[in-house]
Amino acid sequence: MPRVFLVVMDSVGIGGAPDADKYFNGEISDFGSNTVLHIAQYMEKLGRPLKLPQLNSLGLGSAIFHSVGIEHPDLPVSNNANWAVGRETSKGKDTPSGHWEIAGLPVTWDWHYFTEKTNSFPKEIIKSICEISGVNGILGNKHASGIEIIEEFGQLHVETSMPICYTSADSVFQIAAHETAFGLDRLYELCEKLSPMIHSLNIGRVIARPFLGSKDEGWRRTKNRKDYAMVPPSPVLIDWVKAAGRKTYSIGKIGDIFSMRNIDFNVKGSDADLMQKLEEHT
């Protein structure tokens, strides 16, 4: 009986979509983006070839050439592989949009975004966070990188218990909190209770971003991230597989992205741990 292993390599891009010029990272346009090809070109300048023999044997170089019409010696075109290039039709470039479309549900609507770079969140959201967590306020309230904002507010968070709240160019509301000083279960409870309000604004995800450490030792994010995503409004691949009487397994954040609907087994961990789990099922 056939099985399918669908692996999404996050941010391993092989060329921008036709509408890439409409999307940005900060002030930088996504037009011309091609992560794998650009890495190969950079490594070539350093005199250190990019070695991806397994991926090339599966057709990576062929896919890149088809995508952008550029062939690189470290990404050779293969005549003995089955490959394809997908062109996303969903409007967003966020995680739910891409994963849902891969699973058969293109996102044809516009997500809402917190566009203000500072003071990003409405007072109603901040009030709800305070009521749920019993705190006097929040930290952050801006666009930020997860690592940088923990460095900026980690110590004050530990001292005050005020959660660190931030967003990005994606349709997300992220909350970082110390696993012991604030409490992991408390963070999960906050995100779970807050998510209906956030989803009602058409924001795709609330993300719990737990971390550990101290000011002296440094801060580190843990593997206990949890995404509270909107429920897919229509059936997706996982639902069809389940309806056919088969078992479904998810690793990493996939279960969260699909709201655990029709997921039989869900495994989380580091990237290495997750790949080991994948190998155990091959």
Regions found by a protein language model. Name each.
Residues M1-T282:
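…; additionally, a secondary subgroup of soluble metalloenzymes is captured
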